[in-house]
């Protein structure tokens, strides 16, 4: 357990090294904290990107009119990933639809059963073909298993007599 914790800690420290200066932000001090360049550090700012928030450490004199990806180069990959996730979620919602409305509406279940019957009568296409073939293979395997079981039952009846 301790070894797992140690390995995890080392992996996280290697993957996410601490910033150059690791010190607390001096909020109540009268002396402003200065960088070697003479610029004053601002407290962390939450930058909103979609539904996710990113912490930004930087100078208060920066131009806030820039886009989040331009003003925070260290978070550009995170912002791209967040946008990709949002796009994926929207695409999935568009294809699947609102699942919650299907659960609440029992009338649609009857329509779904009618739709399934209609689909079983029609020749399957593309992805449906794969599932159709899989279903038929499973049915054939089940029928073969039942035939073997019936044959073994007949043999047992012949051996032991009725």
UniProtKB/Swiss-Prot annotation:
Residues 25-119 form a propeptide. The modification Phenylalanine amide is found at residue 160. This is Corticoliberin. GO terms for cellular component: extracellular region. This hormone from hypothalamus regulates the release of corticotropin from pituitary gland. Keywords: Amidation, Cleavage on pair of basic residues, Hormone, Secreted, Signal. Pfam families: CRF. Residues 1-24 form the signal peptide. It comes from Carassius auratus. PANTHER family: CORTICOLIBERIN, CORTICOLIBERIN/UROCORTIN. SMART domains: CRF. It is found in: Secreted. Belongs to the sauvagine/corticotropin-releasing factor/urotensin I family. The lineage of its organism: Eukaryota, Metazoa, Chordata, Craniata, Vertebrata. GO terms for molecular function: hormone activity.
């Amino acid at each position: 357990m301790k070894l797992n914790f140690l390995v995890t800690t080392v992996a996280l420290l290697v993957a996410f090294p601490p910033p150059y200066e690791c010190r607390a932000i001096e909020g109540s001090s009268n002396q402003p904290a200065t960088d070697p360049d003479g610029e004053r550090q601002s407290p962390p700012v939450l930058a909103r990107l979609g539904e996710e928030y990113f912490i930004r450490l930087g100078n208060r004199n920066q131009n806030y009119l820039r886009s989040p990806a331009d003003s925070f180069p260290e978070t550009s990959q995170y912002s791209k990933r967040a946008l990709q996730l949002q796009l994926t979620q929207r695409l999935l919602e568009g294809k699947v639809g609102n699942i919650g409305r299907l659960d609440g509406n029992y009338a649609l279940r009857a329509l779904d059963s009618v739709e399934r019957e209609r689909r079983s009568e029609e020749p399957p296409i593309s992805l449906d073909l794969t599932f159709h073939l899989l279903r038929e293979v499973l049915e054939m395997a089940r029928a073969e298993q039942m035939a073997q079981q019936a044959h073994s039952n007949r043999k047992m009846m012949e051996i032991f007599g009725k």
